[in-house]
Amino acid sequence: MIKVAIVGASGYTGVELIRILHSHPEVAVTCVTSEQSAGRPVSSVFPSLRGRCDIVLENLEPVGIAEKVDIVFTALPHKAAMEVVPTFMKMGKDVIDLSADYRIHDADTYGKWYEPHLNPELLPEAVYGIPELRRAEIAEASLIANPGCYPTSVILGLAPLLKGKVIDPRSIIVDAASGTSGAGRGAKVDNLYCEVNEGFRAYGVGGVHRHIPEIEQELSLLAGNPLNITFTPHLVPMDRGILSTIYSQPTGSVKAADLIALYQAFYDGEPFVRVLPEGVLPSTAHVRGSNFCDIGITVDQRTGRVIVISAIDNLVKGASGQAVQNMNLMCGLPETLGLDLLPVFP
């Protein structure tokens, strides 16, 4: 059995890792950590785990964690991850980091959007963990930068168009909507029930959302040239899910049927990407609790613009499920192991 630690297990991505790995036939979760809830069974923090996972949360130094396990998942906020990841790496442990700390290749860019990087020497070692595009690199990696939730939905939604040079890379506009779990479990006034319920609002407007450099980095690699996008996130009064509506201008005349065929060929054999038939569009309700990314494509006949809509569960394909998918690849296991999760509907 592969022994794993979940560092930062008292957040939403942490408990989602526990939920998924509990059914993984090759994994034993042997260490879960939390500063605030140390000494308590994890099931007392998350009653949904009662009777199935009662492991006690610990507050350990990185060395103590590394001594117990083979692989470490760091489900920590940015900066907190880069304070502990170097120790795990020095002790020979594979690390899958769910924070933003190792996603951006350039330390100066990271510093502009976040803060000065504490260990920029590790950035070249980190592999951006989007399996559909980096499968071979992930299999050889010892440090995975697990992608963000919005970036996952946008990158998977645009990859075939950019690789196929079907669209003008300068024309990309993204409107993306997320459930409230994307903001984490910490208490914030903006996430209170009365602030969110019966409302729908934009935030991070005007090119200031921190996922923008991550998205642009990966889309630029796909396009073969640097590009900028217009990205506007929105908050939806639901627990989980992301729906991204992506607009772009094609380089020539295109038909929806041809674009769907392009996507089907690009994602042929991918276990977690579902390209929908013409006239069928994704819904977050149909991916909830699963590792799927559903993609629908159409063309605005009046303006000629291509419209791609992608739907994911922000806590699964947008975080913990993709992390387990990466772990499977790193360990030489079947990629879908532990991830055969049917969406929860209704």
UniProtKB/Swiss-Prot annotation:
**GO BP: any one term:** L-arginine biosynthetic process
Q: Specify whether NADP is a keyword of the entry.
A: yes
User: Which residues carry out catalysis?
Assistant: C149
Q: Which SMART domains did the record assign?
A: Semialdhyde_dh (SM00859)
Its annotated pathway reads:
Amino-acid biosynthesis; L-arginine biosynthesis; N(2)-acetyl-L-ornithine from L-glutamate: step 3/4
Main location per the UniProt record: cytoplasm
Q: Which InterPro entries match?
A: AGPR_AS (IPR023013), AGPR_type-1 (IPR000706), NAD(P)-bd_dom_sf (IPR036291), NAGSA_dehydrogenase (IPR050085), Semialdehyde_DH_NAD-bd (IPR000534)
Q: What class of enzyme is it?
A: oxidoreductase
Compartment list: Cytoplasm
GO terms (molecular function) for this protein are: N-acetyl-gamma-glutamyl-phosphate reductase activity; NAD binding; NADP+ binding
What HAMAP family has UniProt attached to this entry? ArgC_type1
Protein's job: Catalyzes the NADPH-dependent reduction of N-acetyl-5-glutamyl phosphate to yield N-acetyl-L-glutamate 5-semialdehyde.
Per the record, the similarity remark reads: Belongs to the NAGSA dehydrogenase family. Type 1 subfamily.
* Protein name, UniProt field: N-acetyl-gamma-glutamyl-phosphate reductase
What organism is recorded for this protein?
Answer: Citrifermentans bemidjiense (strain ATCC BAA-1014 / DSM 16622 / JCM 12645 / Bem)
